[in-house]
Amino acid sequence: MKKNLITSVLMTVVTTVLLGLVYPLLITGLAQVFFKDKANGQIISANGHAIGSRIIGQPFTGPAYFHSRPSAAGNGYDASNSGGTNLGPTNQKLVDRVKQDVSALQPEANGKPIPVDMITTSASGLDPHVTPANAEFQVARVARERGMSETQLRQLVARHTEGRQVGFLGEPRVNVLELNLDLDGTQPMPTPR
């Protein structure tokens, strides 16, 4: 009995050290060597300050910016509250929110169909991407607010459209933060008069 107890305690200590200390440090070290940017959250900096992450969305509300899709992660892309809403398609709370979002987008739609990712959240609630259709839907508004041509803006969106991974995984997508940063660099907002 004493031998079994010693063996059990020893196994617990060994596995705790191996799996709780050695393995995480090894994986962290390998990630820092081979995937430094990805291991550190793919932070985007401007003027020496971190302004966001390439892999975590953030809200944009001004009319001169492309807007991200709605977030189910708390109050606007709160990473500590990540996750879907678990609201089913017949849940009245979800139905009311979608109706409200559709109503708010109707003036901008001008008869065009509203892309589904403009009114639905992603599984994590933190998705930094929108579909190319979502970006296209917003082109007229952003071009008008920035005082630039829709053609010029579509070229900018095309430059930021990422294809499928390995040619067949996922869907084409546009990173909203990167697009808006490039937009600010290409065509700063007009100064108010």
Curated annotation (Swiss-Prot):
Keywords: ATP-binding, Cell inner membrane, Cell membrane, Ion transport, Membrane, Nucleotide-binding, Potassium, Potassium transport, Transmembrane, Transmembrane helix, Transport. It is found in: Cell inner membrane. One of its GO terms (cellular component) is plasma membrane. It is a single-pass membrane protein. The keyword Magnesium does not apply. One of its GO terms (molecular function) is P-type potassium transmembrane transporter activity. Belongs to the KdpC family. The system is composed of three essential subunits: KdpA, KdpB and KdpC. This is Potassium-transporting ATPase KdpC subunit. It comes from Koribacter versatilis (strain Ellin345).
